[in-house]
């Protein structure tokens, strides 16, 4: 039995055309949830999306691990001549 609360984090995705994906995140992005966020971000890039819009209007907290995921995603997109927009 685990008495620790599960971190709250969720992401929904919406594709806009062939190259753009909106990732609408909610909750907290930290060391416990960053791997799930990284997985979704990397999947979008692997799917050939070169324009990512990250809607963080419902993100309550982000730590340095989450910021690292953002920077790594930005680097990958930049190498592909893509862009990342944070809302």
What function would you assign to each model-found segment?
Residues 28-87:
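Amphipathic alpha-helical interaction surfaces in cytosolic regulatory modules
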Residues 4-39, 56-58:
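STAS-typified acidic loop motif
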């Amino acid at each position: 039995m685990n008495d620790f609360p599960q971190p709250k984090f969720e992401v929904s995705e919406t594709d806009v055309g062939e190259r753009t994906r909106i990732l609408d995140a909610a909750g907290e992005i930290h060391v416990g949830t960053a791997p799930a966020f990284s997985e979704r971000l990397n999947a979008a890039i692997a799917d050939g999306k070169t324009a990512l819009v990250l809607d963080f209007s419902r993100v309550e907290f982000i730590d340095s691990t989450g910021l690292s995921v953002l920077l790594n995603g930005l680097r990958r997109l930049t190498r592909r001549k893509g862009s990342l927009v944070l809302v």
